[in-house]
Swiss-Prot record:
It catalyses: N-acetyl-D-muramate 6-phosphate + H2O = N-acetyl-D-glucosamine 6-phosphate + (R)-lactate. The keyword Lyase applies. Homodimer. It holds the Pfam family GKRP_SIS_N. Residues 55-218 form the SIS domain. Keywords: Carbohydrate metabolism, Lyase. This is N-acetylmuramic acid 6-phosphate etherase. A lyase-type mechanism (elimination/hydration) is suggested for the cleavage of the lactyl ether bond of MurNAc 6-phosphate, with the formation of an alpha,beta-unsaturated aldehyde intermediate with (E)-stereochemistry, followed by the syn addition of water to give product. The active site is at 83 (proton donor), 114. The gene is murQ. Specifically catalyzes the cleavage of the D-lactyl ether substituent of MurNAc 6-phosphate, producing GlcNAc 6-phosphate and D-lactate. Together with AnmK, is also required for the utilization of anhydro-N-acetylmuramic acid (anhMurNAc) either imported from the medium or derived from its own cell wall murein, and thus plays a role in cell wall recycling. GO terms for molecular function: carbohydrate derivative binding; carbon-oxygen lyase activity; ether hydrolase activity. Its EC number is 4.2.1.126. It comes from Shigella flexneri serotype 5b (strain 8401).
Length: 298
């Protein structure tokens, strides 16, 4: 696909004179364009749901979720991956973000990194990619060699693969087994795909990881019941989670959390089933960590 023919490289008539308007009007133009992004994502919800189901199946079988991208796309993958351990209590290696150019590229532009096919393959080899893993290639343009080569290598190994881009029929979309292609149109600043395309990618990644965690029993109702209390805010959140899930008061919630070494799931089952910590943990283990199954099947 030629660069000049890509939707993400097109000229947006709504912002053609944005350099001549007031600051407030600049903001209105940008915001009006941003409003179209959720609608673009809405149109690909079936594709996102299919990807979530595949990711969950692979992770349930011992695989990992691997994000692979360059520039903004790579940074968004790293952002999503880094939030999973504290939010859902998963091991840091379960969701992995890889960026062309390595860690230095998180804060700096690395010349030519996205054009390195070898880089995409080597980064996956360096994390010992296996057929159980799912590789999600992220590239707004859909033409990034680093991502395309990584997806090709992953498929050769037998991995399930997902391609996220904002140009229909792109190489990323056709290389991956599953394509997620929210068409957000031309950017306010021509070619600046960190804007609408980046926002669309963030929304999609939110759904992929959140959907995985919900299906893995990490959410009860809408509560993040595997949250790790790494700071005072999250300590208080744990108490509120147990309160909201059980109807107990703050003192009872804190007592239950202390008794089970601050595991929200165990504390919730303790309160709702009137069990001690050991028995509550045992029942959770018997039901794969799903609070709902403990409550519904016993």
């Amino acid at each position: 696909m030629q660069l000049e023919k890509m939707i993400t490289e097109g000229s947006n008539t709504a912002s053609a004179e944005i350099d001549r308007v007031s600051t407030l009007e600049m903001c209105r133009i940008i915001n009006d364009e941003d409003k179209t992004v959720p609608l673009a994502v809405d149109r690909v919800l079936p594709d996102i749901a299919a990807a979530i189901d595949v990711i969950h199946a692979q992770v349930s079988g011992g695989g990992r979720l691997i994000y692979l991208g360059a520039g903004t796309s790579g940074r968004l993958g790293i952002l999503d991956a880094s939030e999973c351990p504290p939010t859902y209590g998963v091991k840091p290696g379960l969701v992995v973000g890889l960026i062309a150019g390595g860690e230095y590229a998180i804060q700096h532009a690395v010349e030519g990194a996205e054009d390195s096919r070898e880089g995409g393959v080597n980064d996956l080899k360096n994390i010992n990619l296996t057929a159980q893993d799912v590789v999600v290639g992220i590239a707004a343009s859909g033409r990034t060699p680093y991502v395309i080569a990584g997806l090709e290598y992953a498929r050769q190994l037998g991995c399930r693969t997902v391609g996220i881009s904002c140009n229909p029929g792109s190489a990323v979309s056709t290389t991956a087994e599953f394509a997620i292609t929210p068409i957000v149109g031309a950017e306010v600043v021509t070619g600046s795909s960190r804007m609408k395309a980046g926002t669309a990618q963030k929304l999609v990644l939110n759904m992929l990881s959140t959907g995985l965690m919900i299906k893995s029993g990490k959410v009860f109702g809408n509560l993040m019941v595997d949250v790790v209390a790494t700071n005072e805010k999250l300590h208080v959140r744990q108490v509120n989670i147990v309160k909201n899930a059980t109807g107990c008061n703050a003192e009872q919630a804190e007592a239950a959390l202390i008794a089970c070494e601050r595991n929200c799931k165990t504390a919730i089952v303790m309160v709702l089933k009137n069990l001690d910590a050991a028995e509550a943990k045992k029942r959770l283990d018997q039901h794969g960590g799903f609070i709902r199954q403990v409550l519904d099947k016993e």
